[in-house]
Structures are given as C-alpha cells and as structure tokens.
C-alpha cells in the first residue's frame, strides 16, 4: 500500500518476449555480446525486485521469454528500456501479453481458485 496515495498496487502477470535487435552480433554467443556483464547485473536486479519471476532464451535462442509481474504494460516498457542491451539495440521488446496463471507453484492450489 502506498502511504501517500492510500492505494494498493495490484500486480498482474505478463508474458514478455524479447527479440534480437540490430545491435546483436549473430556471430557471437550470448555471453560474448557487448555489455553482457552490465545486462546480466541489470536483469539480476529485476529478478531481485520480483519484477522478473522467470525467464531465459527459448528455442534456438533467437528470442527470450520472461514471466513478469507488473502493474501494467507501461511499467514493463519503462523498466526494460533501462536495460543496457535495450540501450545498445541488442534486445527489443517483441510482445507483451497478459498471462492468466492458473497453475502456479508459488500459490498452493492455484488451479482450483
């Protein structure tokens, strides 16, 4: 609850797909991309904050899928825009979709609710 506003911030779950941008060097593995260390520290911070619940490359690694908890799409765009890889054009937001999590090990019995 925000003391100043007297409101409770409601978080929703989202599936966020990130795609390679023009700054991505296809000849280099993921951890050899420019600013890998800065990107990793930034993403770890988002996990520590509870913003990113889970995530990582999918398929052949051309895309990354994240389970994100946020107030809305604007918060997602704003926070991910600060990623060093976003600033360097390595990753772009592909899609952001609301995700109704009916099965969630973090919430016992979630499918029955």
Question: How should these model regions be labeled?
Answer:
Residues 2-113:
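Conserved, structured core segments of small domains
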């Amino acid at each position: 609850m925000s003391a100043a506003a007297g409101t409770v911030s409601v978080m929703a779950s989202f599936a966020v797909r990130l795609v390679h941008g023009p700054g991505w060097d296809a000849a280099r593995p993921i951890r050899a991309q420019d600013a890998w260390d800065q990107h990793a520290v930034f993403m770890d911070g988002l996990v520590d904050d509870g913003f990113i619940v889970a995530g990582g490359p999918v398929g052949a690694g051309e895309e990354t899928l994240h389970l994100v908890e946020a107030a809305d799409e604007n918060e997602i765009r704003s926070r991910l825009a600060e990623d060093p890889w976003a600033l360097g054009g390595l990753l772009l937001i592909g899609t952001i979709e609301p995700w109704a999590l009916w099965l969630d090990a973090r919430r016992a019995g979630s499918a029955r609710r």
